[in-house]
Every structure is written in C-alpha cells, then in structure tokens.
Regions:
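Conserved catalytic core of the tyrosine transesterase superfamily
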Residues: 1-317
C-alpha cells in the first residue's frame, strides 16, 4: 500500500514540475537558460526532500529552513544561497497560484543577509494608467475595474480578494469584512469609488453571468461561475500593466504595497495601516517607513536647489 502511495506522489510531483516548467517558459516568458537555472535549483530541494521522505506538497517551513541550513553548511556562497532560495520561493508561490497549496510554507523563509531590497511600489499616476487600460467594452471589463479598485482601496491580499463574499460587504457603513491568514477576521474601510465600481459590476453580474451552486455569495466570479482564482488576478494585472506601458515587475501584492505606502505618505498612523493590512507584528508594517524614506530621499535629490545647481554645473562641464 505504501509503495502505491509513493508511486502516486511521484507521478503527481512529476506533473507539477512539468506544469511549473511550462509556467516559467510560457507565462513568465523566461529565457531557456533562466528556466534551466530555476529547474536546477529546484532539483536540489527535491533531492533533499526525497532523502527525508517528504512529499513536495507536505513540505513545511521547518523542512525548508533545514534545506537552507544545508546550503550554508556545504559552503555555498551567500548570493548563490539567496538565488536558490528565491527560486524555491517562486516555486511555492506558483503552487499557491495554481491552487496546489492553501498556504505558502516558504513565505517566512529567510535567506542570508546580503542587502535590503524594498518592495516594488506604483505611483498614483501608474495605478490610474493601469485602471484606465481596462476595456469596459468587454464582458469582464467592469469586473476587472472593480477588482483593481478594491485591491488598491483596501490593500487586500489576492487570496482575500478572491474569497470576498457579498455577505462581507457593509457598504452603508463603508467597511468590508476580510478573512485573512489563520482565518483571522478584520474590518477594512472601503472607498466610495470602489463601492461604486463593485455596484456597477453587480449590475453586469446579475445581467447574464452564470453562477454555479454554492458560489452565489462570492463577489468576484470567473466566466464559468466560480469565484475568480489568484492566478487569474495575477495574469490580469500583468496584462494590464503591459498594456499601460508599466515596466515595473508587479503583481497583485504590488497594489497592497502601494496602498500602504500611499497611506503613510499621506500621514496615516502606522498602527492604523497595520490594522488594515492584518499584520500581526508592527515590524512587518515598518517596511513601508523604509519605502517612504527612500522616496523622500529621491524627492530631495531631485528637487533640492543645491542638487539642481550641481547637476547644471556638471552639464556645463
């Protein structure tokens, strides 16, 4: 019986790896060399898990930390360790997007300290360009606009957006109820603009969209009548960003980063932002103070009269 189970797990793993290869090649449009590098690094993890008797879909954070420690122990350079672990995290993000896993065991996986990288953030103008790129003449146009306005208005994780229910909407009070990590619920303010776009979407939704049984309460639907998936939202945003001429590497989570950064720049209290994002620790939210300082420095360098004078002098010489 154990032999049959092991064989089934192996077949499933082979299928997953094949789909991941296709995803890297076709969806991410990576070069053959980059795809090979991802696959080589992934094979290191698979070899480790096989030696430990762990199925890929049963992998825990502890398993990944054990694997990461092994990279250090055999003397792999910190930058190479970081590259390998980044590839591993990308693989588990794919498993989440493709609905193979509910949670991401690699989310809290830390690599070696090789420098601090700030998350990508969109400007208000860039967000407007992305939303304006939506074609409202298509069947999904109004739904897509409501999705983006909700992501930016509420700072939701993509999984929270996909699982949002009509019964969670309290428009008269200006709030929505969100179920976050660990099934923890929170109330999040929602903008009048997002409310308007969701109501417009409901007109379309009720005017011909088929809705499958048991999915009637979901806010955002796919064409086949079930709630929209994370990978669909991911591809939607990638497509719209390309159409809008945005070259930054963005994802649904970029809207969450932008939401928090713009609130902080507007003077919002860090604790209030923590509550809206559903962060357990204020330390997680403090990343946005780094972004704010980084942008502030860029503004000063760009507009300070001494810097302007220096740039002009350099142009003359």
């Amino acid at each position: 019986m154990k032999s049959e189970e092991k064989s089934t797990n192996k077949e499933k793993q082979t299928l997953i790896i094949r789909k991941y290869h296709q995803y890297l090649k076709l969806e991410k449009a990576l070069s053959p060399n980059t795809v090979d590098a991802y696959q080589t690094d992934l094979q290191k993890l698979l070899h480790f898990l096989e030696g430990e008797g762990i199925a890929i879909l049963d992998t825990t954070l502890d398993d990944l930390q054990h694997f990461a420690s092994g990279l250090h122990d055999i003397g792999i350079h910190p930058r190479s360790q970081a590259r390998i672990l980044a590839g591993i995290k990308a693989f588990f993000q794919f498993l989440g997007m493709a609905d193979y896993l509910e949670g991401d065991p690699s989310e809290l996986l830390e690599g070696p300290k090789i420098g601090f990288k700030l998350p990508e953030v969109l400007t208000v103008e860039e967000i407007d360009r992305i939303i304006s790129a939506i074609d409202l003449g298509t069947n999904e146009g109004q739904r897509n606009r409501a999705i983006l306005e909700t992501l930016y208005s509420c700072g939701l994780r993509v999984s929270e957006l996909c699982n949002l229910k009509i019964s969670d909407l309290y428009f008269d009070e200006g709030f929505i109820k969100v179920e976050g990590k660990g099934s923890k619920q929170r109330l999040v303010p929602i903008s009048s603009r997002a409310i308007k776009e969701i109501r417009n979407w409901f007109v379309d939704r009720n005017g011909g969209w088929k809705i499958k049984k048991d999915f009637e309460d979901y806010v955002f639907l796919a064409r086949w009548g079930k709630n929209i998936s994370r990978i669909m939202v991911f591809h939607l945003i990638k497509e719209l960003a390309k159409k809008a001429g945005i070259t930054k590497n963005i994802s649904p989570h970029t809207f969450r980063h932008s939401f928090a950064t713009h609130l902080l720049e507007g003077g919002a209290n860090l604790r209030a932002i923590q509550s809206m994002l559903g962060h357990e620790s204020i330390a997680t939210t403090e990343i946005y103070t780094h972004i704010d300082r980084h942008r502030l420095r860029s503004e000063i360098i760009e507009h300070h009269p001494r810097n302007i004078k220096y740039r002009k002098e350099r142009e003359i010489h």
